[in-house]
């Protein structure tokens, strides 16, 4: 399952990550690159409906605005959760470090250190998701053992 992302001009897949404030993985969904970000978020959040009952705030990129807010509100267990969209300032082009966005980018950087995740070697999206989970388990175990700086 590969697609073409016309915004970034790339073939392949998108990795949708749901992380906590420490950058540790809570959920992952891998989709074709042609799938819009908010549609990927809908499929990811559908799996998480009943797992995180204490969650009250979700920070998201501008790409996740729109239907996602209405969809979250329509779900009874998720009505207590507020979706905060981290917006880019008007008129600024190029790279800009956005508040809270760097949490996910840092996790992507951690995952990029694993050779198996540096390129899209996997045929099935489920295999990609599994390899991301394995890499995060390895990272968390090393962090618990104190062999890697946090």
For each of these PLM feature ranges, what is it?
Residues 1-78, 84, 88, 135, ...:
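Polybasic low-complexity intrinsically disordered regions
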Residues 50-51, 77-80, 89, 107, ...:
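Positively charged, low-complexity intrinsically disordered regions
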Residues 66, 91, 142:
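Surface-exposed, flexible loop/turn segments at secondary-structure boundaries
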Residues 85, 94-150:
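Basic, amphipathic alpha-helical segments enriched in Lys/Arg and hydrophobic/aromatic residues
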